[in-house]
Amino acid sequence: MKHDGVVRISLLLIASIITLAALYYSQAIMAPVTFALFTVAIAWPLQSALQKRIPVLLALVVTIVVTLAVLAILIFLVVWGFGLVFQWVINNTDRIQTLYAQATEWLDSHGVSITNLVADSYNPGWIIGAIREVGGRSYGLVSFIVIAFAFIVLGLLEVDIARRNVEQLNSQSLRRSLLRGAEKIADKFQKYMVVRTTMSLLTGVVVWSFALVAGIELATAWGVIAFVLNYIPFIGPFIATVFPTLFVLVQTGSWQVCFAVFVCLNIIQFVIGSYLEPRIAGAALSMSPFVVLLAVFFWSFLWGIAGAFIGLPIMIAILTICEQHKSTEAIALLLSAGERKSA
């Protein structure tokens, strides 16, 4: 018996390692497909409501247009915000040159020659490599968008078909489990996006208010950037903290003010992103804050930025599936924020 248990655990570990390796190396396909499934779950209520009043294909077109419009608005806001910042930087290059001269002089006085470091680090091969890296990432982004869009369209078209196929299964328990599990996953995905959007709006408003009070120029742009980037856990808030900090350094020329702004922005991001949001999301989704953070880090490791965004929805789906079966119900209970109702 003991030997059988060891073999069973060993096989489970081997299967887990193989699965994780497969997910890692299939990122180019699995990440956009997973994102598409998540988007279908979010957009389906609109599609379902529309196709009760208009033809299915027309409802699909409207749903796709609305989904793309939301994504386009978010992208536009980021481009608009950083565009204002970039224009401000161009108009204030003299300040940047002055800061660079001061920093170089200070480093030289402490025995660090920044000029020699830059000269030694310069390598045309590095520039070529950087250009190739940018090109590769751009190709990856385009590929991600194309694959995700294709599966979003197909997914929205086949939701009703998939439901009818499940309803024709002979096993009543399996049929009930699949339908109820899918409904719960979709419902939790929608709750997650409500929480995410609420926290992003709160972050944007607080950052905007802080920038106004602190006298930071382009306060609206920084608030908008913080709002949009907050949809990408940890990576987005990091960017929304570092860029305003460097901007303040150029604006004021004071390292003390720069440090103070950096500390304040980190406090804002920590309180909202690491304290309020995990607890609110955990309460809404019956997940512990620890699991919320672990999901983001784990899937970021596997799939990068895409994993950071969809890591928590994946964990939501896994735990919801575990709820539906007696053999795995204990896993969902152990990782929950509190007491769960029996499925």
What residue spans do the PLM features occupy?
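Alpha-helical transmembrane segments and their immediate interhelical loop/hinge regions
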Residues: 8, 140-251, 255-263
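Hydrophobic alpha-helical transmembrane segments
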Residues: 2-19, 78-100, 133-150, 173, ...
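Hydrophobic alpha-helical transmembrane segments of membrane transport and translocation systems
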Residues: 258-343
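Alpha-helical membrane-interface segments at transmembrane helix boundaries
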Residues: 3, 23-27, 47, 51-54, ...
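Hydrophobic transmembrane alpha-helices
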Residues: 36-43, 70, 152-155, 224-231, ...
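Transmembrane helix boundary and interhelical junction motifs in multipass membrane proteins
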Residues: 30, 34, 50, 205, ...
